[in-house]
């Protein structure tokens, strides 16, 4: 979720949902052979974030779907699981939604920060590193329009979510920003509702969301310079990460903050 400053206290909210094309469709749209239907996304919600500001839901933002695209990282997208001639077993789509909010309608909360959030009924059923299956999907962006009017950082490229077994991964989740902000990257726990984290299975965590190569077994110190990369490394200043996946058919959750 990101936001774009339009004028005065008017903002556009931008939401992207990433869909596994082997799973249900979104809003009756998407490629692949699945006939099941996923959740419809029609609105985002607004809540204050501190006790002094009552820490509660205060409204909603209507969302309009603007389109979707196949972002599977292969040369012939039509051969992905999202395409019409699927010979590759995987496929990922990005589905885009937007809405607008005028914070002049919330002047009774002047000085308060807000979470703009979405809440969906279920996650992908194939995720196998979380302690409980098919928990709710909750995600948010923080904004305080009373301090200054500006746009949030935005991601430059779609996330890399498909990794090859025993092949080194050197990638990154990069953002652009024009406000001279200091950007820090970190991995955080997925959430199912406000301040309610989803637990990972034993040996997994937000910082170890996937099985990775470690010469000594598990929980080794990350070393991005080794060949292959050891552990799970994230550069908090640049967004670069590296690891070597060591489990077949593993589906996990990575939250970048």
Which ranges hold each PLM region?
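Long, compositionally biased, intrinsically disordered segments
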Residues: 1-257
């Amino acid at each position: 979720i990101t936001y774009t400053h339009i004028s005065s206290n008017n903002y556009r909210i931008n939401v992207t949902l990433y869909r596994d094309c082997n799973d249900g469709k979104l809003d009756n749209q998407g490629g692949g052979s699945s006939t099941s239907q996923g959740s419809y996304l029609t609105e985002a919600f607004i809540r204050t974030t501190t006790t002094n500001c009552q820490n509660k839901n205060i409204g909603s933002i209507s969302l309009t779907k603007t389109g979707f695209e196949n972002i599977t990282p292969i040369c012939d997208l039509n051969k992905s699981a999202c395409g019409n001639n699927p010979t590759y077993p995987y496929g990922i789509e990005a589905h885009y939604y937007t809405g607008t909010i005028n914070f002049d309608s919330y002047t009774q909360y002047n000085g308060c920060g807000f979470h703009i959030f979405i809440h969906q009924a279920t996650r992908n059923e194939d995720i196998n590193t979380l302690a409980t299956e098919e928990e709710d999907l909750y995600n948010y962006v923080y904004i305080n329009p009373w301090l200054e009017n500006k746009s949030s950082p935005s991601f430059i490229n779609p996330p890399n979510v498909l990794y090859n077994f025993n092949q080194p991964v050197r990638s990154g989740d990069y953002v652009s920003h024009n406000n001279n902000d200091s950007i820090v990257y970190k991995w955080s726990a997925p959430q199912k509702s406000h301040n309610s984290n989803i637990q990972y299975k034993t040996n997994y965590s937000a910082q170890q969301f996937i099985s990775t190569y470690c010469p000594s077994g598990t929980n080794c110190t990350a070393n991005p310079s080794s060949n292959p990369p050891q552990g799970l490394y994230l550069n908090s200043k640049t967004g670069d990460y590296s690891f070597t996946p060591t489990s077949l058919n593993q589906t996990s959750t990575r939250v970048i903050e």
